[in-house]
A protein has these predicted regions:
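Alpha-helix boundary/capping residues
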Residues: 1, 54, 63, 112, ...
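M16 family metallopeptidases and their MPP-like homologs
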Residues: 1-48, 68-78, 84, 166-265, ...
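His/Glu-based metal-binding/catalytic segments typifying zinc-dependent metallopeptidases
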Residues: 13-37, 99-196, 354, 358, ...
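Ordered core of a single globular domain
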Residues: 28-112, 325-384
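A diffuse structural propensity rather than consistent per-protein peaks
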Residues: 52, 132-135, 204, 270, ...
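Sterically constrained small-residue positions within well-ordered secondary structures
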Residues: 64, 162-164, 234-236, 348, ...
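Short beta-strand/turn micro-motifs at beta-sheet edges
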Residues: 159-161, 221-233, 344-346, 398-401
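Flexible helix-coil linker/hinge segments at domain or subdomain boundaries
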Residues: 269-273, 383-386
Length: 419
C-alpha cells in the first residue's frame, strides 16, 4: 500500500483529479480534515508499529471471522446455453408474430427500414463542422524529451532513464529471443504464463506471490516485440522475454532475489500444477478471443505476411491457442515433452550473456545496481547458446473460426509499404 501511495499511478486519470476526489472522502464530513486521505505516510508508520501487537488479529476477528453477515454466490457453466436461449427467443418471436395483424407486421418492417436508413445516413457538413477539433497550430512540433543513457554495469548493457520516480526504481530485464526456433515459440508463450504461477524450490507459488508483493510493486513477465524502424522493408524486429519489477531503492535486493527465484528455481516438473495452469490459460485465451475478436482476426490475418505478427500469433494468438489446447486436452501424452521444453528454453533464454536492462530512476537508484546485476548474473545460466537466427515462415491462408459469439469479425490486411 505504501508503494502504491508513493507511485500514485492512476492510469489515464489526472493525478490532481484523483487526489481531489480522495479529499472529499473526509472533507464532506469534517471541514477541518480535508487531507487525511492524501497524507497517508503517518498512517503507514502507525500500522507498521502495530505489527506483533495483536492489532491486526483483532480487526480480522471482529470484522471478518465473527461477522454475521455474508453471502455465497455460485456461478455454474451450462453447455449449450447460447443455442438454448436462441431457440427460446426464436419461439417467442414466432408466437409474437402470430399475434400481430398483417398491418402491424408491415409497420414493424417499415420502421426497421427507416431506422437502418437513419443509421446509415451520412452526417451533414454542418454537423461535422460542429465537432471540436484541434488545429495543426495547436500541436507542438517539439518531441517530448528522451532520457536515455547507456551504461555498462557488471559487463551488462543498462539503459538508464533519469526521471523523478519518488524513490522508486522501475526495472525491465530483457532476454533476447532471436535464436529460439519457430517450433519452440508456443512453448515460450507457455513458459511466460507458467513463471510466477508455479511452486519454486523454496516457496509455494502463493507464498512467493506474498513475498514479492510485501517488498516490491510486483514482478511480471511478458513477451515483447520491437520493429526495426530503419529496416521496415526487410520486416526486421527484435523479440524479448521481459521480466519487469518496480521497488523502492532499499528493496531492490529483494526484487533481484525474487527474480532469480522465478527464473532458476521454478518446479516445472509439478505436473498437477502445470495441468491447472494450462486449463486456466486455455480459458483466458477463449475469453480474450471473444471479447476482442476484431484484434484476434487482424493478428491472424497479419500473420500471413508479417513475421512479427507471426511471432505474436505463435506466442499469444490462435496458433498459440491451438497448441495450448493440444497439450491441455492430451496432457498425459504431452506432459513429458512440455516439461522438457520448459527446462530447455529456460536454459537457453535466461543466460547471463543474453540480458540487457532498462532502469528508470534517479541517479541514486543506481548506487547498488551494479552489485545486484553481478550477483544475478552469477546466479543464472552461464555459457553461450547457438546463435542461429530464427526464421519465421509466413503462409497465406483463407480461414474462419467458429465461436459462441453472436458477432462476426472479418479482417482483410495488407502492408502499405509493399506494392
Amino acid at each position: 500500500y505504501e508503494f502504491r501511495y508513493r507511485e500514485a499511478d492512476f492510469g489515464n486519470f489526472p493525478r490532481g483529479l484523483m487526489y481531489g476526489l480522495q479529499m472529499f472522502d473526509s472533507w464532506l464530513y469534517d471541514d477541518e480534515k480535508p487531507f487525511i486521505h492524501v497524507e497517508e505516510l503517518k498512517t503507514f508508520a502507525f500500522l507498521k508499529e502495530q505489527i506483533g501487537s495483536g492489532y491486526f488479529e483483532e480487526l480480522i476477528q471482529k470484522y471478518i471471522l465473527d461477522n454475521p453477515h455474508g453471502a455465497i454466490v455460485v456461478i455454474k457453466p451450462e453447455k449449450g446455453r447460447t443455442a438454448r436461449l436462441d431457440k427460446e427467443l426464436a419461439e417467442r418471436l414466432q408466437e409474437y408474430k402470430k399475434s400481430l395483424s398483417e398491418a402491424e407486421v408491415e409497420k414493424i418492417v417499415a420502421d426497421t427500414k427507416e431506422l437502418i436508413a437513419y443509421q446509415e445516413e451520412p452526417s451533414t457538413k454542418e454537423e461535422l463542422e460542429a465537432i471540436p477539433v484541434l488545429e495543426i497550430e495547436d500541436i507542438s512540433k517539439e518531441i517530448a524529451p528522451i532520457y536515455n543513457e547507456e551504461l555498462h554495469l557488471a559487463d551488462t548493457l543498462v539503459v538508464h532513464h533519469d526521471v523523478e520516480t519518488n524513490g522508486i526504481s522501475y526495472l525491465s530485464l530483457m532476454f533476447d529471443l532471436s535464436d529460439v526456433p519457430e517450433e519452440q515459440l508456443p512453448y515460450v508463450g507457455i513458459l511466460q504464463s507458467v513463471i510466477g504461477m508455479i511452486d519454486t524450490n523454496n516457496y509455494a507459488y502463493g507464498e512467493l506471490f506474498n513475498e514479492i508483493n510485501m517488498s516490491t510493486g510486483g514482478i511480471g513477465t511478458s513477451l515483447e516485440v520491437y520493429p526495426n524502424v530503419t529496416k521496415v522493408s526487410e520486416k526486421e524486429f527484435k523479440a524479448a522475454f521481459e521480466v519487469k519489477t518496480k521497488a523502492l531503492y532499499d528493496k531492490l535486493p529483494v526484487a533481484f532475489q525474487m527474480i532469480r527465484e522465478l527464473l532458476m528455481e521454478s518446479k516445472f516438473e509439478d505436473e498437477k500444477r502445470l495441468e491447472e495452469i494450462l486449463a486456466l490459460l486455455k480459458s483466458r485465451l477463449q475469453m480474450k478471443f471473444q471479447s476482442s475478436g476484431h484484434m484476434t482476426a487482424v493478428l491472424r490475418a497479419m500473420s500471413y505476411r508479417s513475421p512479427m505478427s507471426q511471432f505474436k500469433d505463435l506466442t499469444n494468438g490462435i496458433a498459440f491457442y491451438e497448441k495450448v489446447c493440444k497439450i491441455a486436452d492430451h496432457f498425459e501424452e504431452e506432459k513429458a515433452a512440455l516439461i522438457m521444453n520448459l527446462k530447455k528454453l529456460s536454459e537457453q533464454i535466461f543466460r547471463a550473456d543474453n540480458m540487457i536492462i532498462s532502469c528508470t530512476s534517479r541517479k541514486e537508484g543506481l548506487e547498488e545496481l551494479e552489485k545486484l546485476i553481478r550477483e544475478l548474473k552469477n546466479g543464472i545460466y552461464q555459457g553461450t547458446a547457438d546463435h542461429t537466427p530464427c526464421i519465421l515462415h509466413c503462409e497465406k491462408k483463407n480461414e474462419g473460426f467458429q465461436t459462441a459469439s453472436k458477432v462476426q469479425y472479418v479482417a482483410r490486411t495488407g502492408n502499405f509499404m509493399e506494392e
